Every structure is written in C-alpha cells, then in structure tokens.
Amino acid sequence: EGAKGVDLIQELKKARAEGKVLRVVFLGVNGVGKTLTIAKVARRLMMTGFKPVIAAADTFRAGAIEQLENYASEVGVEVVSRKYGSDPASVVYDAVQRAIARGMDAVLADTAGRMHTNVNLVEELRKILRIAGEPQLKILVLDALSGNDVLYQAKYFMDHVGFDGMIFTKVDANAKCGGIITAVHQTHRPILFIGTGQSYDDLEEFRVDAFLSEILG
C-alpha cells in the first residue's frame, strides 16, 4: 500500500558487489524485543552466507550489553562493545572499522530506546547514523501487541530520524494485529520480517497476502 520494497539480502548483495559493508541500524523503544531481533537477523544472515558483526551501541540501559553478548554468543556472532556510558557512535564506528578490516558484510547496530525519558536520544541516534556512514539501512523494531503505541512510535521515529523498513515482534501471540497494517499505511515503509517466537529461527519474511488472510480469515 504505497510502501516501497526493501530486501535486506538484496541490499547485502549489492553492498558486497561494491566491496562495501552494509550498516544496519536498529531503532525502537525499550521492551519491544530489539536485542533478540538483532540476534535473529544475524543468524539469518549467517545462514544465507553473510558475515555480520554486532555493535552494542545501547550503552545506556543496564544489562543491554550483556544481554546482546549472550544472544550473540549463542548464534555465533562477534560483538563490538565498550563500557556503559561510552559514546554509542564510537561503538558503531569501531564495529564498521572491524568489519572493513576483516572483510565482513554487515554491521548490525543496537541502539538505546529511552524515547520517553531522554530528549538527547534523538541527537544520539542522529550522530550514530552520521558516523555509521553509507550504505545504510535503518530498521524500526515494533511490538505487534502494542496497539495504538505502534503508530505513535512509528511516527516518532519517522519524524525524528526516519527509517527504511520495520520488523514486528510478538506476532505469534496474536495474529489479528491491525496496528501492523496501519503502520505500513501511515509510514509508507515496508515490513521486512515478523518475529513469531523466542527461538533464533523464529523470524519470517512478511508476506502481506498471508497476513491479510489471517486477519480476514
């Protein structure tokens, strides 16, 4: 519905053909399942023959780095991190440099999600996006069960930093998630994947026809 398509694998192939590292920056508020989603995406890329590295650029939320490192070790992906309170953009910069030096394909960057409590977050995200460089893909992670909050969050990030596509989590819990369709309609951005469970393999490409048949079924 007016959403331009974004294919993560095709973007990776294009970057690889040009000898470049794709920078994938994950946006989203705390509690939507962003960290697990990054691990799922990393696993999917590895299964497709790509080599990603994860940047632990949420240096604000207590436990965020350890959680990400735990997930990453379970899927076998390297993490670049610094201590809490570090400049998140510098973590992303380090990860990009490591990826370039080691001939890796993508940097998957986690970011802070303290939307409601800290106005500096937007400036922090803008700096991360600027330092990360091109080619770049911004993915907004949303919780399918958040109701009207989904649209509010999508609009907030679109207005302040923009994004190229969305991943919805917790779709398994309730197939009738009208907020998903509304978010696509309002932002004109596509849904790349949906999270359908807690396993690292529970990440499916979003197929609008199948989803609509679930809703209308």
Please state what every model-predicted region is.
Residues 4, 8, 75-76, 111, ...:
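Glycine-rich, flexible loop/turn motifs
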